[in-house]
């Protein structure tokens, strides 16, 4: 990796969700994708949305995404399969913790839209070699605090997380 890897992405040893994976917060290409997808997202959800941030990750064999709900910036979320081996995501739409959930398989190019703050979601232990995902996150313009949270509290898109206000 280049000496610039901490600018464009990095291996995160202490990541709370998936330690020791390569990840990128706010990659400029992914943030551009988020803006390009916004009209379709608004049509799909029936909501006017503010863009929050993007996050991309390369998962490896043995990784596991524990059951969780997301933070406020992930109110309206997507996960898009960019390539690699199959790795289903599970959602629990009833809102009841601990239930089995619904399995969703995503092929490369497929994108799932979900309410990240409301739905428990997870992935079981990964058995493949690698799986590349990007997450595009938005807020509903009508949600209190959404305007102040635009761009995940950065002055504009494309900036690293340390620019948050």
Residue ranges of model-derived segments:
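Conserved active-site beta-strand element of glycosyltransferases/polysaccharide synthases
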Residues: 58
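Catalytic core of non-heme Fe(II) oxygenases with the double-stranded beta-helix
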Residues: 61-122, 130-134, 139-154
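Glycine- and charge-enriched low-complexity intrinsically disordered segments
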Residues: 149-165
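A short coil-to-beta-strand element that immediately follows conserved catalytic motifs
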Residues: 46-55
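Alpha-helix initiation and capping sites
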Residues: 31-35, 50, 69-72
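Non-heme Fe(II)/2-oxoglutarate
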Residues: 1-45
């Amino acid at each position: 990796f280049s000496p610039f890897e901490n600018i464009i992405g990095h291996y995160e040893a202490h990541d709370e969700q998936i330690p020791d994976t390569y990840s990128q917060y706010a990659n400029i290409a992914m943030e551009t994708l988020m803006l390009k997808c916004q009209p379709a997202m608004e049509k799909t959800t029936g909501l006017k949305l503010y863009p929050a941030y993007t996050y991309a990750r390369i998962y490896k064999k043995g990784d596991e995404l524990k059951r969780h709900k997301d933070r406020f910036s992930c109110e309206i979320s997507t996960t898009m399969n960019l390539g690699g081996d199959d790795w289903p995501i599970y959602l629990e739409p009833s809102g009841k913790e601990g239930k089995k959930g619904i399995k969703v398989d995503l092929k490369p190019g497929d994108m799932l839209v979900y309410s990240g703050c409301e739905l428990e979601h997870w992935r079981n232990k990964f058995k493949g070699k690698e799986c590349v995902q990007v997450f595009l996150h938005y807020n509903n313009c009508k949600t209190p605090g959404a305007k102040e949270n635009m761009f995940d509290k950065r002055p504009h898109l494309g900036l690293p997380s340390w620019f948050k206000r």
